[in-house]
Swiss-Prot record:
Organism: Bos taurus
InterPro entries with a match to the protein in the record: KsgA/Erm, rRNA_Ade_diMease-like_C, rRNA_Ade_Mease_Trfase_CS, rRNA_Ade_methylase_Trfase_N, rRNA_adenine_dimethylase, SAM-dependent_MTases_sf
Subunit-structure text: Interacts with mitochondrial RNA polymerase POLRMT. Interacts with TFAM. Bound to the maturing mtSSU until the late stages of assembly.
Binding site for S-adenosyl-L-methionine: L38, G63, E85, K86, D111, V112, N141
Protein name per Swiss-Prot or TrEMBL: Mitochondrial dimethyladenosine transferase 1
Enzyme class: transferase
Entry keyword Transferase: yes
Superkingdom assignment: Eukaryota
PROSITE patterns (UniProt xref): RRNA_A_DIMETH (PS01131), SAM_RNA_A_N6_MT (PS51689)
Primary gene name: TFB1M
EC number assigned by the record: 2.1.1.-
Family, as annotated: Belongs to the class I-like SAM-binding methyltransferase superfamily. rRNA adenine N(6)-methyltransferase family. KsgA subfamily.
One Pfam family matching this protein: RrnaAD
Amino acid sequence: MASSRTLGTFRLPPLPTIREIIKLFRLQAVKQLSQNFLLDLRLTDKIVRKAGNLTNAYVYEVGPGPGGITRSILNAGVAELLVVEKDSRFIPGLQMLSDAAPGKLRIVHGDVLTFKIERAFPESLKRQWEDDPPNVHIIGNLPFSVSTPLIIKWLENVSQRNGPFAYGRTRMMLTFQKEVAERLTATTGSKQRSRLSIMAQYLCDVQHILTIPGQAFVPKPEVDSGVVHFTPLTRPRIKQPFKLVEKVVQNAFQFRRKYCHRGLGMLFPEARRLESTGKLLELADVDPTLRPTQLTVSHFKSLCDVYRKMCDEDPHLFAYNFREELRQKSKKEDDKQSCRL
């Protein structure tokens, strides 16, 4: 583990370009892994500047690939940069960067979805949740294939104040498909408003910082990308367990073009669905004819608070899954058909 230290200005020595690194190590983007490389260091410098002042910061980079953003982070004067890369083909190129920046770059060959970050940096960096954010940052050009499950995982970590957020309100600067970036930051009533909008915005201040055109990447993806900045809130806008909030929000957006009562009704068994849905909406003071995209975070706070009380009254309610009820119903129908034959 690195020790806390004050560093002077640092610049990497002359190195092969990212394009030359790709050629030298015969690297090719794997389409199945949604890999796309940023080669323009002016653009990677811009992304890193948007993360804020990184002088003497401790940075966790996910999915560094051939190291474009990695170089820009190192040149920002960080105290230490920890990169986690799953694809072994990129390790030699990253090792070249490590050799050029002694003591500043740590490389972990592993999976960001399972890597334990909470013990990676000095204990002295930890801050109380109500204090200013710690000098720890997460930066990453995420492969599109893992971006949504990863941000949901980290949002759950925010709610539990563990993982990267064991240090405090760790800030994140992450690249997504533009459509995902727009969903994360969508306002009430927007056509992009979604489950991701609510889950991100009830826990964090979320800003769509930058759009990166597809032609900036090699190979060129079919869609543009968006850079999103997250700062965890000192107080979540919904004070209920993450899994409960997630369940309510997921069900609300089951039928995004229909009235909200349609999806919210799926929280309850069919035998009492109409009655329980009416009770939920009445006690939460939510208009049943609103579309899911028209629901505010405050609406979801009320819905989650009432649903929590209903779960407390009925210990079996939270475990209810309408898909399982449909499956059991379908199985019974199949059994009846078999008996008739």
